[in-house]
């Protein structure tokens, strides 16, 4: 008869994780730095990455420009540190970055900042913009602080609840 199983222990999990640096690259030049996203692993005074830098190596491996750039940043586990080598107008620049698991919150914050700038530009700063990420007490307190410091001086208010994850403000 023997032993057989079709349980959870038989499942093989193949998972890759993306090591996010916060460095964004040009769409048409996938190894050329477009910018560095605010408050990410690469957005540190000690990390010297600038728009226009061209990625040459990741952890000592010379990049192949015909290969998908993301393959250099995806592994079964996160590296503790990534060493990136760039060409900056003929000068070699080497940086070490501690990658992060995700940049989703940073992208969300940038989206809010861009919305704020759009509202300011289109209304000549006469309409306030406030985004509440959720309905928790922390976000409610931020709203109250904004109301008392700045928003009350405006002619109108846009309270943006898009992508709000919910919560219990009423408690």
Which residues fall in each region the model found?
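Catalytic cores of secreted or luminal carbohydrate-active enzymes
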Residues: 1-3
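Cleft-lining beta-strand/loop regions that shape enzyme active-site pockets
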Residues: 6-8, 12, 35, 41, ...
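PDZ/PDZ-like domain segments forming the peptide/carboxylate-binding groove
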Residues: 15-65, 137
């Amino acid at each position: 008869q023997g032993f057989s199983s079709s349980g959870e222990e038989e499942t093989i999990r193949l998972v890759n994780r993306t090591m996010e640096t916060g460095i964004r690259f040009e769409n048409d030049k996938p190894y050329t730095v477009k910018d560095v996203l605010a408050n990410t692993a690469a957005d540190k005074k000690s990390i010297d990455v600038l728009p226009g830098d061209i990625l040459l190596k990741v952890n000592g491996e010379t990049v192949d420009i015909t290969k998908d750039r993301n393959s250099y940043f995806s592994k079964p586990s996160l590296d503790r540190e990534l060493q990136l080598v760039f060409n900056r107008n003929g000068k070699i620049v080497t940086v070490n970055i501690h990658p992060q698991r995700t940049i989703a919150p940073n992208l969300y914050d940038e989206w809010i900042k861009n919305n704020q700038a759009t509202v300011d530009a289109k209304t000549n700063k006469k309409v306030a913009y406030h985004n509440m990420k959720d309905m928790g007490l922390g976000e409610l307190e931020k709203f109250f602080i904004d109301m008392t410091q700045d928003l009350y001086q405006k002619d109108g208010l846009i309270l943006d609840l898009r992508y709000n994850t919910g919560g219990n403000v009423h408690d």
